[in-house]
Amino acid sequence: MGIFPGIILIFLRVKFATAAVIVSGHQKSSTLSHEMSGLNWKPFVYGGLASIVAEFGTFPVDLTKTRLQVQGQSIDVRFKEIKYRGMFHALFRIYKEEGILALYSGIAPALLRQASYGTIKIGIYQSLKRLFVERLEDETLLINMICGVVSGVISSTIANPTDVLKIRMQAQGSLFQGSMIGSFIDIYQQEGTRGLWRGVVPTAQRAAIVVGVELPVYDITKKHLIVSGMLGDTILTHFVSSFTCGLAGALASNPVDVVRTRMMNQRAIVGHVDLYKGTLDGILKMWKHEGFFALYKGFWPNWLRLGPWNIIFFITYEQLKRLQI
């Protein structure tokens, strides 16, 4: 009979141990659930909404930038002619020759791009910052730049197919045929998955530069204006900060942006090699065939777009942040 108390004792020990493991597991699960519920979803949603508003408001300027950047290519007969002398000339000529709707050629994939790119970019940027520092006062330029570069690369890579279609629709204007979904399918059927991610490297490089410059410059400028007592957390502060970061972003990103635009606009043709094999190759070829300042083609519309785009975006974003949701 002495064996039964031993068996019972072992059984009870196993049951208590199992119960302890289960309780511990529930506690860890509860902690994890609490941490997950603590993740802030607002930067993702607000970033996407503000990006869509800013994109729609500045799209015609972005279209003229694309037209200016693709023209004058001595090694691509489709865009060899220099049709536009500048941003305003391009706006008036496109309106006169193609109609007002041509100024919004590519708006559908552009808004789709911002719905994905803008949402992911701002959400990841804000989330990464909170991983490094808990308080806004502890943020530094270096930390913000690292977070900006990472969020820019991830978001632009995911949204690349919409960028490809947008640029092709902008470049061809009223000559572009087909719907947005049909055009995605056509690119995939004719050029494969590679076609949808054509130019993804310079796109990610540009995004790393733009986001890695714009968002940190905005945050640091805003922080300085508020902490120094020059301005409070007002719309004027948001305006000055966004204008400054737009100029900084345009200066830093324009050369890569020109190459990216041309790489996305070139098509895969059997028996032909790509005109530009990569960012560095594109920059060197443009410098050689068109001169150094070709790298800053479309700079004024680029800045005049990034300036108003950032102003609209950040003011909209800051106002959304104040909503009691």
UniProtKB/Swiss-Prot annotation:
Residue spans of the Solcar repeats: 42-131, 139-224, 233-323
Membrane topology: Multi-pass membrane protein
A GO CC term assigned to this protein in UniProt: mitochondrial inner membrane
Tissue spec. comment: Mainly expressed in brain, particularly abundant in cortex, hippocampus thalamus, amygdala and hypothalamus. Highly expressed in heart and kidney, but not liver or lung (at protein level). In the nervous system, expressed in cortex, basal ganglia, substantia nigra, cerebellum, and spinal cord (at protein level).
Biological process terms in GO annotation: inorganic anion transport; regulation of cellular response to oxidative stress
Disulfide bonds: none
Assembly mode: Homotetramer.
Protein name according to UniProt: Brain mitochondrial carrier protein 1
Organism this protein belongs to: Mus musculus (Mouse)
